[in-house]
Amino acid sequence: MSLVTLQVGLFFTVIVNAKFQEDSKHWRGLAEVELEEALSYKWNTNRAKNVIVFVGDGMSPDTITASRIYRAGETSRLAWENFPHIGILKTYNVNKQVPDSASTATALFGGVKTNFEVVGVNANVPLGDCNASLNTDYHVDSIISWAQAVGKDTGFVTTTRVTHATPAPLYAHSADRRWECETKMPLGAKGCKDIARQLVEDLPGKNIKVIMGGGRQMMKSNATGTQFDPIDTWAGQRKDGRDLIEEWKKDKISRKLSFDIVQNNEELLRVDAKKVDYLLGIFANGHINMDWNRERGPKGQPSLEEMTVSALKILQKSKRGYLLVVEGGLIDFAHHRGHAAQALLETVRFSDAINATMKMINTDETLVIVTSDHTHSMSFNGYSDRGSNILGIAQKSKLDGIPYTTLTYSTGGPNNQAYTLMNNSSVRIDPSKENTTSFTYSQQATIISDEAYHGGGDVTVYAIGPFAHLFHSVHEQSYVARVIAYAAKMKPKAYGNSSGRGEYSTSIVFSLYFCTFLLTSLCQ
């Protein structure tokens, strides 16, 4: 059955059957089933031998809803929407209402909120301050470090560069997320290591067993392009003469460790997980290509699902368990370019990776968390009919009579222009004259700048497995790392004892609540 046939079938199923099936009995029956499931659910309080964290970069609640509809209609569910526990995370930074990915990843993976665009350091490090970032008292250790400290194997896979903003706080400490390689660092930062070097030279990076993603230009000096992988002009290029991929290899040889290095689909398929303990997969000079135009042949790049499955096959050999972080990073990239169709497809592929994972694990002993780092400026609006194409036209404006799409952006780049000049007047462009379902179509935006910007809204967190019920309310984003540490009994020193009280005594907690109450009263 073709995709078009499936979409048409779903559309007519909804239209024809809605009158007869979706009556009062239908909705009350659904509610009864959900209630029974909730009442019969039992909390899992086993120790989490394994932890898997999925991060959909820029995956806002509207992105999730739109992707659900895009995939299979309004009543369908993405992989994580079957998880029993859900919470809300506040994403603001210490110094910004709307965050970036490096600061939010530091909160998610290190349990400490910090300044905009810094990596793995606390708020005592201003953006770009190399000297401050060298103070180890300001370093924020991550869940990767905690897992390694208790003997677990660790890994991460991403569709972005392995040195990019979201994965970097797993292993690096930097005053600027842009310092991925030495050419991106100013003269005043020469005393600091670039992020790529920290991945290869320092702990915990050098002991991460599985690393997969893009970013060859950051790892290898004077990297060259190919037919399937041209030079990424958006990314920096290493030029210090070093080949960190080769240095990673030499480190593993010197420690007599079994390893493999792969750079395309056919090489990844040949990996024998039984014989390999360390795997480095760098599949692109910059980010891995968007799924809609990714080369799938032998010399092409693997999907997020394929990388995730390969990572699990290696990590699951560990008798003491593992921690794996998986980032669907191109959801964010698509949104920044104002291409909603690309963002929705990347979200569906993110769901595919989670579906594949759930078939390989036992949730009695594995905690799975799915969340996002921040929202985006895409909005889902208008009054389109049930069963409409989510990428199509919603209706005509009652003011200017011109149609508008169901998905739009509040901010966007030059390609997201909503108005054109006609007879010395500004006139809104009619999107119905274009193919709004195309992957290259740019939805209209209200404010035009260099690109579509992040949103400052809350994100959702979904969980299943040991202690998943600890996600139950509105939480600070930094709470996620604490739950992981508690569920896996990793006991990082920063949190004190394992009772959940950590360093906060009753008097301190009372004082914090009192101060909050006082400030709220004064502001009224």
Question: What positions do the PLM features span?
Answer:
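Glycine-rich phosphate/pyrophosphate-binding loops
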Residues: 139-145, 149-169, 492-495
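His/Cys-centered metal/cofactor-coordination and adjacent catalytic loops
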Residues: 120-137
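Active-site-adjacent structural elements in enzyme catalytic domains
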Residues: 47-72, 135-151
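A post-motif C-terminal structural segment
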Residues: 20-33, 44-49, 59-65, 69-110, ...
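Structural beta-sheet core signal
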Residues: 53-54, 156, 370
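Cleavable N-terminal signal peptides of Sec/SRP-targeted secreted and luminal proteins
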Residues: 1-18, 508-522
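C-terminal GPI-anchoring signal of eukaryotic secretory precursors
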Residues: 492-511
